[in-house]
Protein backbone atom coordinates (compact mmCIF):
# COMPACT_ATOMS: atom_id res chain seq x y z
CA UNK A 1 0.00 0.00 0.00
CA UNK A 2 1.52 3.32 -1.13
CA UNK A 3 0.50 5.35 1.94
CA UNK A 4 1.80 2.83 4.53
CA UNK A 5 4.90 3.65 6.62
CA UNK A 6 7.67 1.37 7.80
CA UNK A 7 10.65 1.89 10.15
CA UNK A 8 14.19 1.93 8.76
CA UNK A 9 16.39 -0.69 10.45
CA UNK A 10 19.39 1.68 10.52
CA UNK A 11 18.18 5.16 11.44
CA UNK A 12 14.89 4.09 13.04
CA UNK A 13 12.94 6.67 11.04
CA UNK A 14 9.54 6.00 9.50
CA UNK A 15 9.65 5.85 5.72
CA UNK A 16 7.01 5.16 3.07
CA UNK A 17 6.82 1.48 2.20
CA UNK A 18 7.42 1.98 -1.52
CA UNK A 19 10.66 3.93 -0.76
CA UNK A 20 11.93 1.76 2.10
CA UNK A 21 14.34 -0.36 0.01
CA UNK A 22 16.04 2.66 -1.62
CA UNK A 23 16.20 4.51 1.73
CA UNK A 24 17.80 1.63 3.61
CA UNK A 25 20.44 1.13 0.91
CA UNK A 26 21.41 4.81 1.11
CA UNK A 27 21.17 4.91 4.92
CA UNK A 28 23.43 1.92 5.48
CA UNK A 29 26.01 3.34 3.11
CA UNK A 30 26.22 6.92 4.46
CA UNK A 31 24.50 7.21 7.89
CA UNK A 32 25.32 5.83 11.32
CA UNK A 33 23.62 6.30 14.70
CA UNK A 34 25.41 8.41 17.32
CA UNK A 35 25.97 6.25 20.42
CA UNK A 36 25.27 9.25 22.71
CA UNK A 37 22.19 10.92 21.28
CA UNK A 38 20.97 8.07 19.02
CA UNK A 39 20.61 10.48 16.12
CA UNK A 40 21.57 9.51 12.51
CA UNK A 41 24.79 11.25 11.47
CA UNK A 42 26.86 11.08 8.31
CA UNK A 43 29.78 8.75 8.72
CA UNK A 44 32.40 11.32 7.80
CA UNK A 45 30.91 13.83 10.30
CA UNK A 46 30.66 11.47 13.27
CA UNK A 47 33.93 12.57 14.89
CA UNK A 48 33.08 16.24 14.58
CA UNK A 49 29.58 15.56 15.88
CA UNK A 50 30.87 13.78 18.99
CA UNK A 51 33.43 16.49 19.78
CA UNK A 52 31.13 19.42 19.17
CA UNK A 53 27.79 18.08 20.36
CA UNK A 54 28.66 15.68 23.18
CA UNK A 55 31.58 17.51 24.70
CA UNK A 56 31.07 18.22 28.43
CA UNK A 57 30.96 21.91 29.28
CA UNK A 58 30.39 23.70 32.59
CA UNK A 59 27.28 25.78 33.27
CA UNK A 60 28.26 29.38 33.90
CA UNK A 61 25.70 29.74 36.72
CA UNK A 62 25.88 26.47 38.69
CA UNK A 63 29.24 25.16 37.33
CA UNK A 64 27.64 21.77 36.61
CA UNK A 65 29.07 19.75 33.68
CA UNK A 66 26.52 19.12 30.97
CA UNK A 67 26.73 18.05 27.31
CA UNK A 68 27.29 20.98 25.03
CA UNK A 69 24.21 20.26 22.93
CA UNK A 70 21.93 20.38 26.02
CA UNK A 71 23.51 23.45 27.64
CA UNK A 72 20.80 25.82 26.43
CA UNK A 73 17.95 23.70 27.76
CA UNK A 74 19.80 23.22 31.06
CA UNK A 75 20.25 26.96 31.59
CA UNK A 76 16.64 27.70 30.69
CA UNK A 77 14.85 24.92 32.59
CA UNK A 78 17.09 22.87 34.91
CA UNK A 79 19.69 25.16 36.47
CA UNK A 80 18.87 26.00 40.12
CA UNK A 81 21.00 29.14 39.96
CA UNK A 82 19.18 30.68 37.03
CA UNK A 83 17.63 34.11 37.68
CA UNK A 84 13.87 34.40 38.11
CA UNK A 85 11.69 37.43 38.81
CA UNK A 86 10.26 38.11 42.26
CA UNK A 87 6.47 38.38 42.04
CA UNK A 88 6.39 41.32 44.48
CA UNK A 89 9.36 43.57 43.65
CA UNK A 90 10.10 42.30 40.09
CA UNK A 91 13.82 41.98 40.88
CA UNK A 92 15.94 39.10 39.53
CA UNK A 93 16.61 36.48 42.23
CA UNK A 94 18.28 33.05 42.04
CA UNK A 95 15.81 30.18 41.78
CA UNK A 96 17.10 28.38 44.88
CA UNK A 97 16.64 31.56 47.00
CA UNK A 98 13.43 32.96 45.56
CA UNK A 99 11.19 31.35 48.23
CA UNK A 100 13.07 32.99 51.11
CA UNK A 101 13.21 36.30 49.26
CA UNK A 102 9.48 36.35 48.51
CA UNK A 103 8.67 35.41 52.13
CA UNK A 104 10.40 38.55 53.43
CA UNK A 105 9.44 40.72 50.48
CA UNK A 106 5.77 39.77 50.84
CA UNK A 107 5.66 41.13 54.41
CA UNK A 108 6.16 44.68 53.20
CA UNK A 109 3.02 46.81 53.12
CA UNK A 110 1.49 48.91 50.40
CA UNK A 111 -1.38 51.37 50.47
CA UNK A 112 -4.61 49.95 49.07
CA UNK A 113 -5.94 52.49 46.53
CA UNK A 114 -9.55 51.49 47.26
CA UNK A 115 -9.80 51.70 51.06
CA UNK A 116 -6.56 53.51 51.98
CA UNK A 117 -5.35 50.80 54.39
CA UNK A 118 -1.80 49.43 54.51
CA UNK A 119 -1.86 45.79 53.39
CA UNK A 120 0.97 43.24 53.09
CA UNK A 121 2.08 42.58 49.53
CA UNK A 122 1.48 38.82 49.72
CA UNK A 123 -2.23 39.34 50.46
CA UNK A 124 -2.70 42.58 48.56
CA UNK A 125 -4.17 40.93 45.45
CA UNK A 126 -6.81 39.03 47.45
CA UNK A 127 -7.50 42.10 49.59
CA UNK A 128 -8.11 44.27 46.54
CA UNK A 129 -10.60 41.78 45.13
CA UNK A 130 -12.55 41.76 48.39
CA UNK A 131 -12.22 45.51 48.79
CA UNK A 132 -13.56 46.20 45.31
CA UNK A 133 -16.53 43.92 45.97
CA UNK A 134 -17.25 45.86 49.16
CA UNK A 135 -17.05 49.15 47.26
CA UNK A 136 -19.52 47.86 44.68
CA UNK A 137 -21.92 46.79 47.41
CA UNK A 138 -21.71 50.22 49.00
CA UNK A 139 -22.37 51.91 45.69
CA UNK A 140 -25.47 49.77 45.21
CA UNK A 141 -26.83 51.01 48.53
CA UNK A 142 -26.40 47.80 50.47
CA UNK A 143 -25.23 48.63 53.96
CA UNK A 144 -22.49 46.51 55.46
CA UNK A 145 -22.94 45.78 59.20
CA UNK A 146 -20.11 47.30 61.23
CA UNK A 147 -19.33 45.93 64.70
CA UNK A 148 -20.51 48.40 67.33
CA UNK A 149 -17.75 49.84 69.53
CA UNK A 150 -18.12 50.76 73.19
CA UNK A 151 -16.93 54.05 74.72
CA UNK A 152 -16.03 54.56 78.38
CA UNK A 153 -18.06 57.29 80.13
CA UNK A 154 -15.68 59.43 82.22
CA UNK A 155 -18.42 60.25 84.72
CA UNK A 156 -19.53 56.73 85.75
CA UNK A 157 -16.68 54.66 84.18
CA UNK A 158 -19.17 52.40 82.40
CA UNK A 159 -18.76 51.10 78.84
CA UNK A 160 -21.55 52.58 76.69
CA UNK A 161 -22.42 51.56 73.07
CA UNK A 162 -21.27 54.18 70.58
CA UNK A 163 -24.77 54.91 69.25
CA UNK A 164 -26.03 55.64 72.80
CA UNK A 165 -22.96 57.41 74.18
CA UNK A 166 -24.00 61.06 73.73
CA UNK A 167 -27.49 60.44 75.14
CA UNK A 168 -25.98 58.67 78.15
CA UNK A 169 -23.31 61.37 78.58
CA UNK A 170 -25.90 64.16 78.73
CA UNK A 171 -28.00 62.26 81.27
CA UNK A 172 -24.99 61.19 83.34
CA UNK A 173 -23.68 64.77 83.40
CA UNK A 174 -26.95 66.08 84.83
CA UNK A 175 -27.11 63.34 87.46
CA UNK A 176 -23.48 63.75 88.53
CA UNK A 177 -23.71 67.54 88.76
CA UNK A 178 -21.25 68.19 85.92
CA UNK A 179 -18.19 67.32 88.03
CA UNK A 180 -15.23 67.15 85.68
CA UNK A 181 -12.80 64.23 85.90
CA UNK A 182 -9.73 64.61 88.09
CA UNK A 183 -6.73 66.16 86.27
CA UNK A 184 -3.74 64.06 85.39
CA UNK A 185 -1.33 63.75 88.29
CA UNK A 186 -3.95 64.32 91.02
CA UNK A 187 -5.51 61.57 93.13
CA UNK A 188 -8.49 60.08 91.45
CA UNK A 189 -11.42 58.95 93.60
CA UNK A 190 -13.95 56.67 91.90
CA UNK A 191 -17.35 58.39 91.73
CA UNK A 192 -20.42 56.69 93.07
CA UNK A 193 -22.88 55.21 90.62
CA UNK A 194 -25.67 57.50 89.28
CA UNK A 195 -28.15 54.80 90.33
CA UNK A 196 -27.15 55.22 93.99
CA UNK A 197 -27.62 58.99 93.73
CA UNK A 198 -31.09 58.51 92.28
CA UNK A 199 -31.98 56.14 95.13
CA UNK A 200 -30.84 58.70 97.69
CA UNK A 201 -33.02 61.38 96.07
CA UNK A 202 -36.08 59.14 96.22
CA UNK A 203 -35.46 58.23 99.89
CA UNK A 204 -35.39 61.79 101.21
CA UNK A 205 -35.65 65.21 99.63
CA UNK A 206 -33.14 66.49 102.15
CA UNK A 207 -30.51 63.94 101.09
CA UNK A 208 -30.00 65.30 97.61
CA UNK A 209 -26.76 66.01 95.75
CA UNK A 210 -25.84 69.55 96.76
CA UNK A 211 -22.69 69.80 94.70
CA UNK A 212 -22.64 73.12 92.84
CA UNK A 213 -22.48 73.33 89.07
CA UNK A 214 -19.56 75.77 89.26
CA UNK A 215 -16.83 76.19 91.81
CA UNK A 216 -17.55 79.91 92.34
CA UNK A 217 -21.02 79.11 93.68
CA UNK A 218 -19.46 77.78 96.88
CA UNK A 219 -18.44 81.24 97.95
CA UNK A 220 -21.89 82.37 99.19
CA UNK A 221 -22.55 79.68 101.86
CA UNK A 222 -19.30 80.51 103.63
CA UNK A 223 -20.01 84.25 103.94
CA UNK A 224 -21.71 85.44 107.08
CA UNK A 225 -25.29 86.43 106.31
CA UNK A 226 -25.12 89.27 108.90
CA UNK A 227 -21.93 90.77 107.53
CA UNK A 228 -22.43 93.93 105.51
CA UNK A 229 -18.79 94.78 104.99
CA UNK A 230 -17.49 95.22 101.46
CA UNK A 231 -13.98 94.64 100.23
CA UNK A 232 -12.06 97.87 99.67
CA UNK A 233 -11.17 98.90 96.15
CA UNK A 234 -7.96 97.56 94.72
CA UNK A 235 -8.14 94.39 96.78
CA UNK A 236 -8.81 90.92 95.46
CA UNK A 237 -12.57 90.34 95.38
CA UNK A 238 -12.22 86.56 95.41
CA UNK A 239 -13.76 85.24 98.63
CA UNK A 240 -11.49 82.85 100.51
CA UNK A 241 -13.07 79.55 101.51
CA UNK A 242 -12.77 78.40 105.09
CA UNK A 243 -12.40 74.81 106.14
CA UNK A 244 -13.13 73.57 109.64
CA UNK A 245 -10.28 71.55 111.06
CA UNK A 246 -10.10 70.56 114.76
CA UNK A 247 -12.70 73.15 115.66
CA UNK A 248 -10.72 76.12 114.28
CA UNK A 249 -11.29 78.19 111.17
CA UNK A 250 -8.44 78.36 108.70
CA UNK A 251 -8.38 80.66 105.65
CA UNK A 252 -7.09 79.17 102.40
CA UNK A 253 -5.35 80.84 99.48
CA UNK A 254 -6.99 81.03 95.98
CA UNK A 255 -4.66 78.31 94.71
CA UNK A 256 -5.65 76.02 97.59
CA UNK A 257 -9.31 76.80 96.91
CA UNK A 258 -8.98 75.67 93.31
CA UNK A 259 -7.26 72.42 94.23
CA UNK A 260 -9.72 71.77 97.07
CA UNK A 261 -12.59 71.55 94.58
CA UNK A 262 -10.81 68.72 92.80
CA UNK A 263 -10.80 66.58 95.97
CA UNK A 264 -14.00 64.62 96.50
CA UNK A 265 -15.10 63.02 99.77
CA UNK A 266 -18.22 61.12 100.80
CA UNK A 267 -20.63 62.42 103.41
CA UNK A 268 -20.53 60.25 106.55
CA UNK A 269 -24.32 60.51 106.86
CA UNK A 270 -25.78 60.12 103.36
CA UNK A 271 -22.68 58.83 101.46
CA UNK A 272 -23.01 61.52 98.75
CA UNK A 273 -19.76 62.40 96.94
CA UNK A 274 -18.99 66.13 97.40
CA UNK A 275 -16.10 68.56 96.87
CA UNK A 276 -14.11 69.11 100.06
CA UNK A 277 -15.05 72.82 100.60
CA UNK A 278 -18.78 72.01 100.71
CA UNK A 279 -18.52 68.75 102.62
CA UNK A 280 -18.44 70.22 106.15
CA UNK A 281 -21.39 72.53 105.53
CA UNK A 282 -23.36 69.64 104.03
CA UNK A 283 -22.51 67.26 106.88
CA UNK A 284 -23.84 69.73 109.46
CA UNK A 285 -27.16 69.86 107.66
CA UNK A 286 -27.18 66.06 107.37
CA UNK A 287 -26.53 65.64 111.11
CA UNK A 288 -29.34 68.04 112.00
CA UNK A 289 -31.68 66.25 109.63
CA UNK A 290 -30.70 62.84 111.04
CA UNK A 291 -31.16 64.04 114.63
CA UNK A 292 -34.57 65.51 113.83
CA UNK A 293 -35.64 62.23 112.28
CA UNK A 294 -34.43 60.38 115.39
CA UNK A 295 -36.50 62.59 117.65
CA UNK A 296 -39.59 62.08 115.52
CA UNK A 297 -39.18 58.31 115.74
Curated annotation (Swiss-Prot):
Residues 178-255 are annotated as: Disordered. The keyword Cytoplasm applies. Gene3D superfamilies: 6.10.250.1730, Zinc/RING finger domain, C3HC4 (zinc finger). Keywords: Apoptosis, Cytoplasm, Metal-binding, Mitochondrion, Nucleus, Tumor suppressor, Zinc, Zinc-finger. One of its GO terms (molecular function) is zinc ion binding. It is found in: Cytoplasm; Nucleus; Mitochondrion. GO terms for biological process: apoptotic process. One of its GO terms (cellular component) is mitochondrion. Residues 229-245 have a biased composition (Polar residues). Residues 202-212 have a biased composition (Basic and acidic residues). It comes from the Eukaryota. A zinc finger (TRAF-type) spans 22-99. Transmembrane segments: none annotated. Interacts with BIRC1, BIRC2, BIRC3, BIRC4, BIRC7 and BIRC8. Part of an complex consisting of BIRC4, XAF1 and BIRC5; the complex formation requires IFN-beta stimulation. Interacts with RNF114, the interaction increases XAF1 stability and proapoptotic effects, and may regulate IFN signaling. Seems to function as a negative regulator of members of the IAP (inhibitor of apoptosis protein) family. Inhibits anti-caspase activity of BIRC4. Induces cleavage and inactivation of BIRC4 independent of caspase activation. Mediates TNF-alpha-induced apoptosis and is involved in apoptosis in trophoblast cells. May inhibit BIRC4 indirectly by activating the mitochondrial apoptosis pathway. After translocation to mitochondria, promotes translocation of BAX to mitochondria and cytochrome c release from mitochondria. This is XIAP-associated factor 1. It comes from Bos taurus.
Amino acid sequence: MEGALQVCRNCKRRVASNHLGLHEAHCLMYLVLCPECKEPVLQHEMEEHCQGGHQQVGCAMCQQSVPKHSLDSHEAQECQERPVECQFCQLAVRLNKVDLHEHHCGQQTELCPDCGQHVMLRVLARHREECQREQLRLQKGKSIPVPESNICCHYCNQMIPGNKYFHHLDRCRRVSGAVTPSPVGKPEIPPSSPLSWAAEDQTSKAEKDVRPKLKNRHRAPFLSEKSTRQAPRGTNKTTNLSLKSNGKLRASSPVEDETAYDILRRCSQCDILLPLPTLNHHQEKCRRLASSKGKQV
